[in-house]
UniProtKB/Swiss-Prot annotation:
The keyword Metal-binding applies. 4-CDP-2-C-methyl-D-erythritol 2-phosphate binds at D10, V11, H12, H36, S37, D58, I59, G60, F63, S64, D65, T66, D67, R144. The record marks H36, T135 as: Transition state stabilizer. This is 2-C-methyl-D-erythritol 2,4-cyclodiphosphate synthase. It comes from Burkholderia multivorans (strain ATCC 17616 / 249).
């Protein structure tokens, strides 16, 4: 079998006046993530992991942050389009594991909703999607609450190969 592993990463600055959307879930908080789209750091990292595993480049190659078509875009829509492109390249998604690093807010109450959204968008059973939340132990820009980071890994298998 032809297995492919992809790794994804994203980080966005926390700012006032923006909603906080992570894993397709709106999270009550006084600040949100700054970005061209909805700035869903988790879905962007997963999208990058999937494109990377299929050797299709990265999220910026497919959904440029200079393209007005993606201004304010729902990252769940972008993730579903990524899935379609990965499948068109002949791959099946096996699983995704991800980590969100945020000093605040606490994400644990939202993890299961994030997993459900991601599983639905990937067309996978829930047990093949994992989301973890960590703090940065008050270290660096993440520890000071200046931003939120996400990392993801994805496993694909080439169909018919």
């Amino acid at each position: 079998m032809d297995f492919r592993i992809g790794q994804g990463y994203d980080v966005h600055q926390l700012v006032a006046g923006r909603p906080l959307i992570i894993g397709g879930v709106s999270i009550p908080y006084e600040r949100g993530l700054l970005g061209h789209s909805d700035a869903d750091v988790l879905l962007h990292a997963i999208t990058d992991a999937l494109f990377g595993a299929a050797a299709l480049g990265d999220i910026g190659r497919h959904f440029s942050d200079t393209d007005a078509a993606f201004k304010g875009a729902d990252s769940r829509v972008l993730l579903r389009e990524c899935v379609a492109r990965v499948k068109a390249a002949g791959f099946a998604i096996q699983n995704v594991d991800s980590t969100v690093i945020a000093q605040a807010p606490k994400l644990a109450p939202h993890i299961e909703a994030m997993r459900a959204n991601i599983a639905a968008d990937l067309g996978l059973p829930l047990e093949r999607v994992n989301v973890k939340a960590k703090t940065n132990e008050k270290l660096g820009y993440l520890g000071r609450g200046e931003g939120i980071e996400a990392q993801a890994a994805a496993l694909l298998v080439k169909q018919g190969g």
